[in-house]
Design a protein with these regions (language model features):
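Glycine- and other small-residue-rich loops at beta-strand/loop junctions that grip anionic moieties
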Residues: 14, 34-35, 57, 92, ...
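Charged helix-capping and loop-helix junction motifs
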Residues: 1-4, 92-101
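N-terminal active-site wall of soluble small-molecule enzyme domains
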Residues: 1-51
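Glycine-rich phosphate-binding active-site loops on the catalytic face of alpha/beta enzymes
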Residues: 35-45, 78-91, 123-153
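Structural motif corresponding to alpha-helix initiation and N-cap regions
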Residues: 19, 39-42, 62, 97, ...
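Catalytic cores of alpha/beta
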Residues: 16-31, 60-73, 105-109, 113, ...
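C-terminal alpha-helix
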Residues: 152-160
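Glycine-rich tight-turn/loop motif centered on a GG-T
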Residues: 10, 51, 85-94
Length: 161
């Protein structure tokens, strides 16, 4: 299934990022891996691959972002949950959109991807506050018209894929 998803993403020129499973990401030659604070260390991941690999790191505190900002192995931060989410069991406390702005004002320069309860009506403000991208699940999976919702999210976020 992962290979089918990877191939579909490549067909549309969209990076295929695997969440938390480093072995799977390397085995199927995914475009990237996203890990949390308590998952495989990013230095270990980078050392295990000899090909370009996008590495994302979950952040929900300023001190985590400051640590990650200094690690060359990290390509982007997943910031969240921004809003309450039902897609994850036992999510961390919500951060709110202003946390993105807080990170930017603190000098965080790596790309920030907002995740957690993000809906279409949030996208423009998140971008205004400094988010480089968004990650969604229910905004698409629970939409009445998946194609239209996906198109609207892409347009609002400035995505050209």
């Amino acid at each position: 299934l992962a290979i089918k998803c990877r191939d579909l993403c490549r067909q549309y020129n969209v990076p295929f990022i695997v969440d938390d499973n480093v072995d799977l990401a390397l085995e199927i030659e995914a475009d990237g891996i996203h890990v949390g604070q308590s998952d495989t260390p990013v230095k270990t991941i980078r050392a295990r691959t000899h090909k370009p690999l996008i590495i994302g790191w979950s952040v929900n505190r300023l001190d985590e972002a400051k640590i990650g900002e200094e690690l060359s192995e990290i390509d982007y931060f997943g910031i969240g949950p921004i809003f309450p989410t039902q897609s994850k069991e036992n999510p961390k406390p919500t951060l709110g959109m202003a946390f993105i702005q807080t990170l930017r004002k603190a000098g965080i320069t790596k790309p920030l991807v907002a995740i957690g309860g993000v809906k279409l009506e949030h996208v423009k403000t998140l971008r205004k506050y400094g988010a480089d991208g968004i990650a969604v699940i229910t905004a698409i999976s629970q939409a009445k018209d998946i194609k239209a919702s996906t198109k609207a999210l892409k347009e609002a976020s400035g995505c050209n894929h």
